[in-house]
Curated annotation (Swiss-Prot):
One of its GO terms (cellular component) is endoplasmic reticulum membrane. It comes from Schizosaccharomyces pombe (strain 972 / ATCC 24843) (Fission yeast). The keyword Ribonucleoprotein does not apply. The keyword Cytoplasm does not apply. It comes from the Eukaryota. It is a multi-pass membrane protein. InterPro entries: 5TM-prot_SCHPO (IPR018291). This is Uncharacterized membrane protein C750.05c. It is found in: Endoplasmic reticulum membrane.
């Protein structure tokens, strides 16, 4: 972990990898001036571009030492660097801040529209479609915490940065596993064509909460092994869940033969097509994000990456579960019920 020391005058963007390999590096004990302060703590700085502040002399200091939540007792290695960068226009920084606010407003507007749609089609709504509201809320909360992290990452509020970052990691892990549970239940038809048993709902929620608790402990105590296990779950188990869900939906579509279940078959077929598209498109979106991140401005790359994330995590699931798709299913259900009443 690295602590950075800075003053407040000029804003620049630098590659820390380049700076640590700079020929202008000086080692020694540098004075901690009154207008300098600790501003950032993070991991793997050699691969991250950040915005930092330098003083009028064109130099800044970096104090590096290992850190954990329990504290550390190590000697500080202080390094000074000479830099010469043009000052970024404050108006340009303000524009990027407005764009971030617009992104958050778009997510909240989408959440409001989804809630209104669920209320408008309340008679034909599925339980799974109500759960989408909770998922969008977690996504919006996650984006809000991300904005708070960016707000404090280069301010004097290092403690608040660490607090926001820890909460952000937990909410992101909760949202991801909640999404996985939702995918499995939808593929099995729970909350769509059949009710969700209480014991099954309690078990699913308990598993997600237990995983989040262990993940939080691993973050708090910096347990590397646990983090590696959860990374394996993130990148290995989730594709297996998608493959299982696709196979089960394919079985559902091929097993429906009667006229009464024709609308149900169309619903599952739409889910199957969307699941296959998401499963195939996700790696491509991540690949494009990496290309854009390496060839465009950092802020622009973040915006495009957020757009891809919105398409993958929000737009596609909401398309599958959009309430207007239930009209044919509800109509055929009413026709079947009326026919059954006439027979009685």
């Amino acid at each position: 972990m690295i602590d950075f020391v800075k003053s407040r005058d000029t804003v620049i963007q630098k590659s820390f990898f380049e700076e640590f390999n700079s020929q202008n590096r000086e080692m020694g004990s540098f004075a901690y001036s009154g207008n300098s302060e600790s501003v950032w703590t993070g991991e793997n700085i050699t691969s991250i571009w950040k915005t930092i502040l330098i003083n009028e002399t064109g130099s800044y200091c970096v104090a590096a030492r290992p850190m954990t939540m329990d504290g550390a007792e190590f000697n500080l290695d202080l390094m000074g660097y000479s830099v010469s960068e043009d000052q970024i226009n404050n108006d340009e920084i303000g524009i990027w801040n407005y764009i971030s606010v617009a992104e958050m407003g778009g997510v909240l507007l989408f959440l409001s529209y989804w809630i209104w749609t669920c209320l408008h089609f309340s008679k034909i709504i599925f339980p799974a479609q109500k759960v989408i509201c909770l998922y969008i809320f977690l996504f919006a909360l996650n984006q809000t915490l991300q904005e708070c992290i960016e707000e404090y990452v280069f301010s004097s509020e290092c403690i608040k940065y660490r607090q926001f970052y820890s909460v952000y990691e937990i909410i992101d892990f909760l949202r991801t596993n909640f999404y996985r549970l939702f995918v499995i239940y939808c593929a099995l038809g729970f909350g769509i064509t059949r009710t969700v048993p209480k014991y099954l709902m309690i078990k699913g929620i308990s598993i997600v909460i237990a995983l989040c608790s262990v993940y939080w402990i691993s973050l708090y105590k910096d347990v590397y092994v646990v983090s590696e296990i959860f990374d394996m779950i993130q990148y290995e188990v989730f594709p297996a869940i998608w493959v299982y869900s696709i196979c089960h939906l394919l079985k559902q579509c091929t097993s429906v033969t009667t006229y009464e279940n024709a609308s149900k078959a169309r619903f599952f077929r739409r889910m199957l097509n969307a699941f296959i598209f998401i499963f195939c498109a996700s790696p491509m979106l991540h690949y494009l994000s990496n290309i854009i991140f390496g060839n465009f401005d950092y802020r622009l790359s973040v915006i495009i990456g957020d757009l891809f994330t919105f398409m993958e995590k929000i737009a596609f699931p909401c398309y599958i579960m959009f309430p207007t798709h239930n009209e044919a299913l509800a109509y055929n259900r009413n026709v079947a019920e009326e026919a059954q009443e006439k027979m009685i």
